[in-house]
Swiss-Prot record:
<protein>
    <recommendedName>
        <fullName>dITP/XTP pyrophosphatase</fullName>
        <ecNumber>3.6.1.66</ecNumber>
    </recommendedName>
</protein>
<dbReference type="GO" id="GO:0046872">
    <property type="term" value="F:metal ion binding"/>
</dbReference>
<feature type="binding site">
    <location>
        <begin position="157"/>
        <end position="160"/>
    </location>
    <ligand>
        <name>substrate</name>
    </ligand>
</feature>
<dbReference type="GO" id="GO:0036222">
    <property type="term" value="F:XTP diphosphatase activity"/>
</dbReference>
<dbReference type="GO" id="GO:0000166">
    <property type="term" value="F:nucleotide binding"/>
</dbReference>
<feature type="binding site">
    <location>
        <begin position="185"/>
        <end position="186"/>
    </location>
    <ligand>
        <name>substrate</name>
    </ligand>
</feature>
<comment type="subunit">
    <text>Homodimer.</text>
</comment>
<dbReference type="InterPro" id="IPR029001">
    <property type="entry name" value="ITPase-like_fam"/>
</dbReference>
<feature type="binding site">
    <location>
        <position position="70"/>
    </location>
    <ligand>
        <name>Mg(2+)</name>
    </ligand>
</feature>
<feature type="active site" description="Proton acceptor">
    <location>
        <position position="70"/>
    </location>
</feature>
<dbReference type="InterPro" id="IPR002637">
    <property type="entry name" value="RdgB/HAM1"/>
</dbReference>
<feature type="binding site">
    <location>
        <position position="71"/>
    </location>
    <ligand>
        <name>substrate</name>
    </ligand>
</feature>
<comment type="similarity">
    <text>Belongs to the HAM1 NTPase family.</text>
</comment>
<keyword id="KW-0460">Magnesium</keyword>
<dbReference type="InterPro" id="IPR020922">
    <property type="entry name" value="dITP/XTP_pyrophosphatase"/>
</dbReference>
<keyword id="KW-0547">Nucleotide-binding</keyword>
<feature type="binding site">
    <location>
        <begin position="9"/>
        <end position="14"/>
    </location>
    <ligand>
        <name>substrate</name>
    </ligand>
</feature>
Length: 199
């Protein structure tokens, strides 16, 4: 019988991604929303701290092992912004948040020339065996690129249509989902997690 593990998200895409990796290690992933667990306030100052807060809260409320990720876009010319606030950069929630976040990013970078628009997507995954686990498994991944001047591509979400990856010569939004999953920050963090679980 597989050991249940709570994923601190309601995002079905993340549940599928994590399930694919963790199934090989005897885990059955359950979304926290399926257990009526709310998300805690993200008060950390780093991606690691926020992922740890979310995993610890899910483990505490469920009594099960837990896993969480925190991720975002880090733009050098903006001193790391949007960073921890990537999902709410424009200060709004809801269906229009992604579009508003992209508009704000373009406004904030309006005077920044080519060659100074370096950015990276960062993902940090934390896994706890129980609420008071003193040695959580931490896996980080990143994808380096730059922010272009106008949106390009129809796939993806968030900042994908503005994030140009030199590795593929296009934006994340121009990649097919299968291709993006191979090189994304989350895919790289999951690869690190997999290697740590297999160790």
């Amino acid at each position: 019988m597989k050991q249940k593990i709570v994923l601190a998200t309601g995002n079905k895409g993340k549940v599928r991604e994590m399930s694919d990796v963790l199934a090989d290690f005897g885990f059955e992933v359950v979304a926290q929303t399926d257990l009526d667990i709310e998300s805690p306030e993200e008060t950390g100052l780093t991606f690691v701290e926020n992922a740890l807060l979310k995993a610890r809260y899910a483990a505490k409320v469920s009594g099960l092992p837990a896993i969480a990720d925190d991720s975002g876009l880090v733009v050098e010319a903006l001193n790391g912004a949007p960073g921890l606030y990537s999902a709410r950069y424009a200060g709004i929630d809801g269906e229009t948040a992604d579009a508003e976040n992209r508009r704000k990013l373009l406004r904030d970078l309006a005077d920044v020339p080519v060659g100074k628009r370096q950015a990276k997507f960062v993902s940090c995954i934390v896994m706890l065996r129980h609420e008071t686990d003193p040695s959580p498994i931490i896996a980080e991944g990143e994808c380096i690129g730059e922010i272009i001047f106008a949106e390009k591509g129809e796939n993806g979400f968030g900042y994908d249509s503005l994030f140009f990856t030199p590795e593929k010569g296009c934006t994340f939004a121009e990649l097919e989902t299968v291709e993006k999953k191979k090189i994304s920050h989350r895919a790289r963090a999951l690869a690190v997690l997999k290697s740590k679980l297999g160790a």
